[in-house]
């Protein structure tokens, strides 16, 4: 997965992890029922004998698995992800289910580059529309997983599904969509309708809600601008999933309100001419294209 900014292709580099909680790995493993007090004593003795880390000694004694150690480390560093997780959460949410997957590492690279090149709270730049030229290029996948990796920084993150044509976030996160963005824009709900995601601290999802008969008109209302302004006050970052640019004007409207957009393309599928037209459409909507991402997943 590569992201191209207005200047160059983003290099691959790492991202910081949140600060540790101070809890010891042994205590976390015991709290989770992975080790007994007797097991912990055995591990400590082995640790002293070999000079290894606690987790390494526990694995060597076959008392825990690699996956259980990674889960404990994630809790120690306040790095939330799903192990068993809520029933029905899609496996597409790879950043939550498999946070050490190479694709997720690339998403963290993109997160880091966006933080360095785009994110600017003082200038009001904390809302990003995720769009593409055509359907099936991975907008919803990228939006959902970017939201997860931002929340893993320990900051409040909001994912809004503004794709009234084919909403998917309610299925990806398995959240109810009786109320959502359409409800808020029509005056039947508030931003507080956004649902916290169980197991992913700091992440909330505002699903599309009931599909309206007038998507573009609803997104053009001043209430959408007001909702985004309020969201920027309450959340560290706001990610918005949109319909494809090539089929509907909705994405231009959302990008205009967000002010910034990330364009998703798919390897071996998206044509250069379609990408160029999508960039023009976003520019015509007075949106800044912060980068173009090639989805290879």
Q: In which residue ranges do the predicted regions lie?
A:
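P-loop NTP-binding module
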Residues: 1-50, 60-83, 87-297
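Short, charged amphipathic recognition helices of the HTH superfamily
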Residues: 53-54
């Amino acid at each position: 997965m590569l992201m191209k900014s207005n200047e160059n292709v983003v290099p691959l580099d790492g991202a910081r992890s949140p600060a540790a909680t101070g809890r010891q790995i042994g205590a976390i493993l015991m709290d989770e029922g992975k080790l007994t007090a007797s097991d912990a004593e055995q591990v400590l003795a082995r640790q002293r004998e070999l000079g290894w880390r606690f987790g390494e000694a526990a694995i060597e004694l076959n008392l825990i698995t690699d996956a259980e150690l990674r889960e404990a480390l994630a809790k120690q560093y306040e790095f939330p992800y799903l192990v068993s997780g809520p029933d029905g959460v899609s496996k597409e949410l790879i950043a939550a289910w498999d946070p050490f997957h190479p694709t997720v590492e690339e998403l963290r690279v993109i997160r880091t580059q966006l933080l360095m090149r785009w994110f600017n709270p003082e200038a009001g730049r904390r809302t990003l529309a995720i769009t593409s030229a055509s359907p099936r290029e991975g907008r919803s996948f990228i939006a959902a997983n970017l939201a997860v990796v931002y929340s893993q920084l320990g900051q409040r993150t909001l994912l809004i599904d503004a794709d009234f044509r084919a909403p998917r976030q309610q299925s990806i996160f398995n959240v109810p969509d009786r109320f959502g963005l359409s409800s808020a824009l029509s005056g039947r709900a508030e931003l507080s309708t956004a649902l916290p995601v169980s197991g992913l601290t700091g992440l909330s999802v505002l699903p599309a809600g009931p599909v309206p008969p007038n998507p573009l008109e609803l997104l053009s209302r001043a209430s959408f601008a007001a909702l985004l302004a309020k969201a920027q006050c309450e959340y560290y970052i706001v990610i918005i999933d949109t319909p494809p640019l090539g089929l509907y004007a909705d994405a231009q409207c959302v990008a205009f309100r967000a002010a910034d957009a990330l364009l998703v393309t798919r390897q071996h599928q998206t044509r250069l001419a379609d990408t160029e037209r999508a960039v023009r459409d976003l520019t015509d909507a007075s949106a800044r294209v912060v980068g173009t991402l090639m989805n290879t997943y």
